[in-house]
Amino acid sequence: MNTNFTKLKMQDAIKTIQNNDLCTLTLCNNGSPFCTPIIYDSDCYCGNIKLTFETCVDGKLSELIENDNNCCCQLTNRCNNKIEVITMEGTCEILPNESTCPCLHEESCFVTVEFTPCKITGRCYGNQRRRNTSCCNN
């Protein structure tokens, strides 16, 4: 078991979430095999965080989000030989979006998703490779 990590303070985790230039964010629907890298913007309101992002997903993932809006986002930031991993559990909502550009398949399209985290946990790993702690692989 790899114990070479430190827990991130909440303010550091939020700072990392807001710095989207250095991070890779992955969206997973509860019980879904899909892990989709996404581009996102963060917005703080009333002390809470809300992420709005556009992602290319197929119809099946969109349907899963609409039927069960419990989602997990995992943000990974690699910096100075350390890996910060922030796991956010919360709810997703697909927003109306005029963009219907096809991406990987004809059935795929870009959708705008609003993610509201309910629980945020973060860890910073040292030089050793971290164990796979992705919320996608529960």
Predicted segments, located by residue:
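Extreme N-terminal tail/first-helix region
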Residues: 1-19
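A short, compositionally biased
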Residues: 17-21, 67-70
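Short solvent-exposed loop/turn micro-motifs enriched in small/polar/acidic residues
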Residues: 18-19, 32-34, 85, 106
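Short, structured beta-strand-loop surface elements
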Residues: 45-48, 56-119
